[in-house]
């Protein structure tokens, strides 16, 4: 085989490697820091929560997301080693509980890491960095939705209230960036289930959350129960 043939083969192999790598990697534009209101989560499931919910917004997950096209998911099948997060498990159980089954927090964290966190590279380096990042955001950076609303005198009283009041309170703590809401109807009343705070792809500054498409559960009415 001549030099020309060797160059052709090397070029084809290199092109194939690039194609495989690019097809197996989905990038992301921004992050959603999603927090769920425990009582509404329990009301949304056909099987009741095993333990009474706290009247708090706690972490659902930190999700790398795209403005257009599919969001990246399941970028690894490697489960979380509980020993690697042993020193932060006490904090995680408080801010990131498995609301549906408090006997299996690790299972919930593992699902969030595999489905979402593993796709956050380079902003998220590994599983321990993923969980520590969430702790920093929720506690140190005070991206705790319950705390944000409480500072604005909006307490979880289980009453109907204007969604715009909730949005304005959150905007005041996120450099006036638009949050994302998810609602559900329960016994004819629309409950606020989730709030998402959006950040850029490097997790360094807030950004507006994209407007949800028509028919999305992320479209909430003017008044919601909280």
Swiss-Prot record:
Which residues belong to the signal peptide in this entry?
1-27
Question: Which residues participate directly in catalysis?
Answer: 60, 112, 116
Q: Which Pfam families match?
A: Ribonuclease_T2
* Highest rank taxon of the organism: Eukaryota
Q: List the disulfide bonds.
A: 42-49, 75-119, 183-220, 198-209
Protein's GO biological process: RNA catabolic process
**EC number, UniProt record:** 4.6.1.19
Its Gene Ontology cellular component terms are: extracellular region
Q: What class of enzyme is it?
A: lyase
Which residues does the record give as RNA binding sites? 36, 60, 98-99, 108, 111-112, 115-116
Q: Which InterPro entries match?
A: Ribonuclease_T2_eukaryotic, RNase_T2-like, RNase_T2-like_sf, RNase_T2_His_AS_1
Mod. after translation: The N-glycans attached at Asn-74 and Asn-77 consist of either monosaccharide (GlcNAc) or disaccharide (GlcNAc-GlcNAc) that could not be distinguished. The N-glycan at Asn-144 contains mannose and xylose, and at Asn-126 contains mannose, xylose and fucose. The N-glycan at Asn-172 consists of disaccharide (GlcNAc-GlcNAc).
Q: State whether keyword Hydrolase applies.
A: yes
Mind listing the GO molecular function terms for this protein? ribonuclease T2 activity; RNA binding
What job does this protein perform? Self-incompatibility (SI) is the inherited ability of a flowering plant to prevent self-fertilization by discriminating between self and non-self pollen during pollination. In many species, self-incompatibility is controlled by the single, multiallelic locus S.
Q: Which family does it belong to?
A: Belongs to the RNase T2 family.
Question: Which named protein is this?
Answer: Ribonuclease S-7
Q: Which organism is it from?
A: Pyrus pyrifolia (Chinese pear)
């Amino acid at each position: 085989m001549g030099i020309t043939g060797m160059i052709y083969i090397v070029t084809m192999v290199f092109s194939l490697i690039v194609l495989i790598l690019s097809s197996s990697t989905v990038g992301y534009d921004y992050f959603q820091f999603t927090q769920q209101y425990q009582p509404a989560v329990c009301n949304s499931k056909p099987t009741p929560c095993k333990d009474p919910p706290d009247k708090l917004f706690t972490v659902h997950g930190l999700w790398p997301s795209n403005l257009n096209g599919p969001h990246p998911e399941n970028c690894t099948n490697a489960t979380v080693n509980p020993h690697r997060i042993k020193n932060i498990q006490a904090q995680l159980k408080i801010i990131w509980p498995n609301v549906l089954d408090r006997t299996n927090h690790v299972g919930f964290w593992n699902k969030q890491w595999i489905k979402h966190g593993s796709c956050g590279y380079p902003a998220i380096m590994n599983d321990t960095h993923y969980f520590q990042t969430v702790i920093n955001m929720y506690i140190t950076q005070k991206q705790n939705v319950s705390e944000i609303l409480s500072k604005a005198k909006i307490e979880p009283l289980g009453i109907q209230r204007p969604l715009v009041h909730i949005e304005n309170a959150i905007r005041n703590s996120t450099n006036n960036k638009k949050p994302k809401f998810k609602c559900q109807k329960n016994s004819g009343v629309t409950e606020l289930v989730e709030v998402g705070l959006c950040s850029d792809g490097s997790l360094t500054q807030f950004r507006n959350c994209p407007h949800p498409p028509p028919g999305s559960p992320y479209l909430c009415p003017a008044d919601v129960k909280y």
